[in-house]
């Protein structure tokens, strides 16, 4: 008999939910992570009394009541509502695109005036079949919004101009004809009081966790420990990149502590011009309505990913989609291994969807 029922590779949200549920069912679990901390990319660390989102802003939002009730077992959530603002050469615009944005941009006051303005610009551009992201954006929201709020930002995000990006990246752009700055139209939204790390710690309460353990480097020995493996690392790395590497976009953060109590007045400010090298600045204290004497900010830079870098976003184009489909065949045929999570499924996953997926899989596993 092996020492554990499950070896769970990755102490992020997927691994933690799986481990919590399996332990509840009296399964013996070992969770390992190659990083020196739990919670994966939702890891928060305390600096100057402020919970800093080390791997970028994470705002919990869901329409799924069961998932909301689930996370509330492990943390109390505050009422934070994501309302980012865009800074274009010192002009401030509300996001997502709504009546506040249109009023600032054109001085329009009513939804009818805003619709007319967008229609007029779409008609003037004369685009019927958008060939690239630029044409797609203009055909959806007109020239002004595109030039000031989309062009520079999106170009920085993807590392290439909008004319070279496929139109399908923005099938739709959320445009609201109400004065509503709530970015996520979700029933439930907030940030766990005390940060995400404390929440994941509670999920892993009573579960054995070993940090700084590289599964792929010690796979042969580690596999002997458990009957089943739950793998949440990169799926292509698991198979030694034998079909080629999947592409990601990476992000680089410059984080600093400032001797001021309020740097930008909002948690998230996007810099939408092409000249500013970073895409946005996060001021972490505003996620929890902090009143600390100092503040911590993170400048976020989009970066081309190369193997060895931290993978953030899968590049969901046709080429990578086809390659992942081939890896998925290998994953499905791998005996005794469950592949899950953002990297294991090569998928852009909101947190609530990760929890849904993990609960679904562990439920079937324990049935």
What is each stretch, according to the model?
Residues 89-93, 99-228, 232, 239:
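Active-site/ligand-binding neighborhood in enzyme catalytic cores
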Residues 4, 26, 207, 225-227, ...:
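Short, well-ordered alpha-helix to beta-strand connector turns
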Residues 20-48:
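Glycine-rich FAD pyrophosphate-binding loop
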Residues 310-367:
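C-terminal catalytic lobe of FAD-dependent flavoproteins
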Residues 40-41, 94-95, 146, 157-162, ...:
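Short catalytic/ligand-binding loop motif for oxyanion handling, primarily in non-cytosolic enzymes
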Residues 4-31, 362, 366:
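N-terminal Rossmann-like FAD-binding beta1-loop-alpha1 element of flavoenzymes
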Residues 215-330:
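Mid-domain catalytic core of redox enzymes
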Residues 48-123:
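Dinucleotide-binding Rossmann-like beta1-alpha1 core, especially the glycine-rich loop
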């Amino acid at each position: 008999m092996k020492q554990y029922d499950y070896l769970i590779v990755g102490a992020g949200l997927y691994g933690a939910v799986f481990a919590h549920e399996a332990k509840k069912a009296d399964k013996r679990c070992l969770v390992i992570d190659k990083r020196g901390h739990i919670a994966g990319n939702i890891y928060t660390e305390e600096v100057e009394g402020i919970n800093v989102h080390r791997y970028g802003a994470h705002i919990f939002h869901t329409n799924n009541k069961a998932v909301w009730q689930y996370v509330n077992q492990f943390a109390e959530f505050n009422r934070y509502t994501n309302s980012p603002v865009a800074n274009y050469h010192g002009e401030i615009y509300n996001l997502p695109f709504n009546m506040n944005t249109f009023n600032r941009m054109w001085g329009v006051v009513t939804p009818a005036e805003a619709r007319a303005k967008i229609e007029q610009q779409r008609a003037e551009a004369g685009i019927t079949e958008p060939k690239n992201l630029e044409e797609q954006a203009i055909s959806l929201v007109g020239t002004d919004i595109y030039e000031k709020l989309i062009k520079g930002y999106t170009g920085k995000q993807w590392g290439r101009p909008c004319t070279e990006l496929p139109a399908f990246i923005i099938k739709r752009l959320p445009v609201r004809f109400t004065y509503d700055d709530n970015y996520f139209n979700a029933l439930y939204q907030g940030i766990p009081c005390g940060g995400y790390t404390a929440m994941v710690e509670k999920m892993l309460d009573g579960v054995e966790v070993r940090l700084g353990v590289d599964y792929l480097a010690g796979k042969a020995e580690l596999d002997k420990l458990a009957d089943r493996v739950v793998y949440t690392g990169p799926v292509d790395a698991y198979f030694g990149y034998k079909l080629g590497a999947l592409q990601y976009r990476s992000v680089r953060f410059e984080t600093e502590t400032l001797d001021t109590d309020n740097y930008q007045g909002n948690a998230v400010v996007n810099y939408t011009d092409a000249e500013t090298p970073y895409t946005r600045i996060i001021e972490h204290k505003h996620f929890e309505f902090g009143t600390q004497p100092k503040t911590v900010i993170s400048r976020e830079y989009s970066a081309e990913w190369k193997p060895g870098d931290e993978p953030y976003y899968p590049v969901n184009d046709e080429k990578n989609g086809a390659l992942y489909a081939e890896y998925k065949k290998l994953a499905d045929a791998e005996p005794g291994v469950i592949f899950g999570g953002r990297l294991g499924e090569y998928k852009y996953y909101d947190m609530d969807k990760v929890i849904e997926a993990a609960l679904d899989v562990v439920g079937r596993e324990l049935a």
